[in-house]
């Protein structure tokens, strides 16, 4: 049985309906609660049940982001970022940095069901301190991509295999201003992706081999955490 609690929202799941109902009864006898039945919407995430699994999406939340940014009717883009990021563009300051940060912060929450925008959101996050007009143009491109993929999300398949797998990669000195590298990884439980990240490395690597080892170390740490968090699961789990 698993219990997810956020402020006054509770999500319960488990393999025994008897235990779930018992816990709900015990909680209800102590606290004022309302049982909403099978989950359909939780913390901005829409959950649709299918015979073969669950589909998680944030379509309504994405629409809200676009509306707040004044880009609900914008022209969609097929990719979140250009092929090459140009660091030598105009450095004119964006007049409303708080607006820039608000949009980027909202996009960070959208990555909960959208691993495809993790890298792009990481790039614009790095420019929140003193955003320029060019940075805002880059942010608008991410929003245009969200517009064109607004119904995308995560499909969680039913799967009896609980082996953990991970994939990682990194560039080398991809950030032209700091010469720091970026690591990306994703981990899977069976055939389902369960965690992902795109993050600039904290220090400069002196070779591509060094940056790859840093990426591997970060991924290994994620695997260790994932395995530890499931240590109480009775099912056998292999780590590859």
Curated annotation (Swiss-Prot):
GO cellular component, as recorded: mitochondrion
Record keywords: Mitochondrion
Entry superkingdom: Eukaryota
SUPFAM superfamilies assigned to the protein according to its UniProt record, in alphabetical order: DNA/RNA polymerases
Database matches in Pfam families: RVT_2 (PF07727)
Localization of this protein: Mitochondrion
Extra facts: A stretch of 270 kb of the mitochondrial genome is duplicated within the centromere of chromosome 2 resulting in the duplication of the gene. The expression of this duplicated gene (At2g07683) is not demonstrated.
Designated name of the protein: Uncharacterized mitochondrial protein AtMg00810
Organism: Arabidopsis thaliana (Mouse-ear cress)
